[in-house]
Every structure is written in C-alpha cells, then in structure tokens.
C-alpha cells in the first residue's frame, strides 16, 4: 500500500487533492558512490588532497495495482528517476576548496502524473534542475573558517508543492546565497 495524493472531482466541478491509499507500487533502482583519490595518481604529495566523486541513483517506480482510475502504470510521486551529485575536493595543507554539481530529474507530485499544474499549484510536474555549490575553508588546531556559495548559477527551481500553509502552491527554493562559518576549539 502506498500513501499519496489522488485528484477527486466533486459535484460542483471542483477538483481537490486528497491524501490516501493510492495502491500497490514497485520501486527499485541502483545507487552508487565512487570517490577517486587523484593525489595518488598524479601528485604523490602528502600535503595535497585531490578527490573526484560522483554519487548517482537510477530509480524506477510504478503503481502496479490501484482502485483509483488512471493510476496503474503511472510513476510514483516524488521519485525522480535520476539523482546525480558530482564534484571535486582539493586541499593543500590546512586549506580546502570544494565544488559540487547536483542534478535531479523531473518528478510528479500526484499519482495521476499530471504534467500541467492547476491554478492552486498543488499538482503538476516538478521540473528537473541543476545546482552548483562551492566552498572553501581553512582549519588549524585551534580555529577554522569556511565560506561558501550555494546555487552559484542562481537557478530558479523548486522541490515541492505545498498543499497547506504557506500554500497551496509552489514553494521556491533559495536563490544564490552565501554563508560563513567560524569555528573555535576551546
């Protein structure tokens, strides 16, 4: 049994999303993390740390049985088919620099797999998106500092649709933002 959202049409012509037992679903896939220590291949220097990483998942999902009309054979909501995170980590002695690129494929927000949203913004596809983050840090035995930028390319994206407060509607994700972290060891 899979709990999710189903669209209901009422006598007055209105369509509302209701949460309930959608039906039986199968979800399967593969996830992998590969982390290469490039220092071992190229530099052979203990002061340098240079890594490339990639984490990816490929997931298939499908409703196999449902009492709801038009649900069987549809993808399960909030299950992107592709999720990739890749990046480089470079460090020299106490300094480090990190970059990460994330890609999430499109996904549905309801069991009908509606591509187009309605006026409320509650149903519809969540489009695929890419996010680039970078950070740099310095750490010593007594203190550390880290600075970073999330969503460097300032991409517009969203990861969910709200059915209640503060919605209903699309909840946008943050634009480019900056942070700084100070660390003191006592």
Where in the sequence are the language-model features?
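Short, basic/aromatic-rich helical patch in the C-terminal catalytic core of site-specific tyrosine
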Residues: 88, 134-137
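Structural motif
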Residues: 91-92, 126, 139-140
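Gram-negative outer-membrane beta-barrel transporters
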Residues: 18-112, 181-183
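Short clusters of hydrophobic/aromatic residues that line enzyme substrate/ligand-binding pockets
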Residues: 3-4, 22, 76, 157
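Flexible, solvent-exposed coil segments and beta strand-coil junctions
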Residues: 7-16, 63-69, 109-117, 158-163
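C-terminal beta-signal and adjacent terminal beta-strands/loops
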Residues: 1, 39, 50, 103-115, ...
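Extracellular loop and loop/strand-boundary signature of outer-membrane beta-barrel proteins
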Residues: 15-22, 68-75, 118-124, 165-170
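Transmembrane beta-barrel architecture of outer membranes
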Residues: 81-85, 131-133, 175-179
